[in-house]
Amino acid sequence: MRLSTHPTLDRFDAVPAASYRPGHGAVRAWLYLLAVLVVAMVAVGGATRLTGSGLSITEWRPVTGVVPPLDAADWAVEFDKYRDTPQYRILNQGIGLDGFKTLYWWEWGHRLLGRIVGLVFFLPFAWFWARGMLGRRLLLGLLGLGLLGGLQGAIGWIMVASGLQPGMTAVAPLKLALHLTTASLILAGLVWLAAGTRPRALAPAPEPVRVVAGLLPALVLVQIWLGGLVAGSKAGLLYNTWPDMDGVLVPPARVLFDKVPFIENFIDNLALVQFNHRLFAYLVVVVAIAHAIQAARTASGSAAAGRAMGLAALATAQMGLGIATLLLHVPLWAGLAHQVFAMAVLIMATVHARLARGVPAATAPTGAEVPIGLEALAGRGA
């Protein structure tokens, strides 16, 4: 039996949620499946970046690109296209066909997984909508995520195209950070909607807890953006000491701000890019720990306090993993683990923020339910 200083939370948990609709269990499972696929997409994308495979496919063919090279002639054509890229001419001239195939399969797998995510989204979405299983807010949220997913595919190609420009051997860091952050936004949106389909009501957390809980996903997203800049520019290889940066806690201004115009330092100055990622990590962890203490004091024994404590632990562990990755000079396994674990922190922060808002209890109906999907079409024809 759970002891709580907020018995209303237990009472709310015993009654249905107002927003819950029949079939929401299937919808919730589908949303979490999509979230898992997006995390897998981020993981494969990270491996593609860390192995230098992202520029191995030089064309964007959303439909026909699903078919990989099937014979020696097909492979020769694809290899010839890659040998015409700056990355090959500057970095990989010694690579043979077998080495190229390794690069190619990583990028092809990443793109294939993107297509699978699209199918797993749109086919069940159409089915759920047709059966009237999506409430209005959920429907609008899913439509927004669908549009964002389509935009993400275009951003991915724009990112790759930036690495095919003369003199480039990798994609532009700014575009990589945008690609990673957009994927993270999609993940957060899926988890937010899934948490909102909870079948049982939940009382909101105290207002101070709700406010900080709502702030934390935004802070995590900013940190993911900064991490994307570090990954894209390889700034993690510049200073591999901690807590100092090659003997100083804060590099001098002449090092952090040596580019003109000033704004370019935040994207292209590797020292400042790494420093910002370090500094913001400290901020996220401090806010998460302070929030856990706040929740323990104002909502002792509640689920919100437990979630806040779990989030603080995850954020601290992620910072520790980031430090280890830095000290080890960013080996593939550590860099990939750090990127994937960031998604775990974001998921926890998003679920916590959504549930802290509460899920209202169902009340007696005050009027006819608004039909949705095919129910609405049938009603018009009646």
UniProtKB/Swiss-Prot annotation:
Uppermost EC category: oxidoreductase
Domain of life: Bacteria
InterPro entries the UniProt entry points to: COX15/CtaA_fam, HemeA_Synthase_type2
Cofactor: heme b
GO cellular component terms, A-Z: plasma membrane
Assigned EC number: 1.17.99.9
Keywords assigned by UniProt, alphabetized: Cell membrane, Heme biosynthesis, Iron, Membrane, Metal-binding, Oxidoreductase, Transmembrane, Transmembrane helix
Name under which the protein is recorded: Heme A synthase
Organism: Methylorubrum extorquens (strain PA1)
